[in-house]
């Protein structure tokens, strides 16, 4: 597999064409962002940690029979992915009240939800990724009724697997963000990454083991992510 020209550069990743039109070469970068990119900081080693954590998680999801874009890890900072057209939705699942959900409804963080709640956010930095509902998704021609139901069902299925993974290493999966993409044949599969950048994780003492240590300036991101990776590697 040969790495070719740059296709896209995002906040935390660079995507390159390869000599296979259906495969992308992905490089994880060291940039940390918050507030939809308003705050940016280069943190040496972050890209390698996220790539390794994401690779381990996606390997486990693939082993469970889920359809994902992940092919294989190439190096500490690189992996191969199936090429997809990203659906402009952030699909968020919440198991515990925290973050923007707590603020929006005036609730205290830490309340365990009786049933997980799935939310959609429109991927548009200029609009600050607004919270939208099913009707908005259809109006914007992002997804059909059946696709919306698929996204919700698949997200709930992924939640069950992820909760098991994180529980095994002593962490609570508070909430997380997923992105999905369409293959050339139109089928929808899980894409992007699953890491402490996209998940809110708490340990048994309620300590944050995710990007909140950066967002809220309450800890060292590299130390936190390294601990998460070390715990995951013990479950191989």
From Swiss-Prot:
CDD domains: SAICAR_synt_PurC. Pathway: Purine metabolism; IMP biosynthesis via de novo pathway; 5-amino-1-(5-phospho-D-ribosyl)imidazole-4-carboxamide from 5-amino-1-(5-phospho-D-ribosyl)imidazole-4-carboxylate: step 1/2. Coiled coil: none annotated. The keyword ATP-binding applies. It is an enzyme of class 6 (ligase). Keywords: ATP-binding, Ligase, Nucleotide-binding, Purine biosynthesis. The gene is purC. It comes from Lactococcus lactis subsp. cremoris (strain SK11). SUPFAM superfamilies: SAICAR synthase-like (SSF56104). This is Phosphoribosylaminoimidazole-succinocarboxamide synthase. The keyword Nucleotide-binding applies. Its EC number is 6.3.2.6. Belongs to the SAICAR synthetase family. PANTHER family: MULTIFUNCTIONAL PROTEIN ADE2, SI:DKEY-6E2.2. It catalyses: 5-amino-1-(5-phospho-D-ribosyl)imidazole-4-carboxylate + L-aspartate + ATP = (2S)-2-[5-amino-1-(5-phospho-beta-D-ribosyl)imidazole-4-carboxamido]succinate + ADP + phosphate + 2 H(+). One of its GO terms (biological process) is 'de novo' IMP biosynthetic process. One of its GO terms (molecular function) is phosphoribosylaminoimidazolesuccinocarboxamide synthase activity.
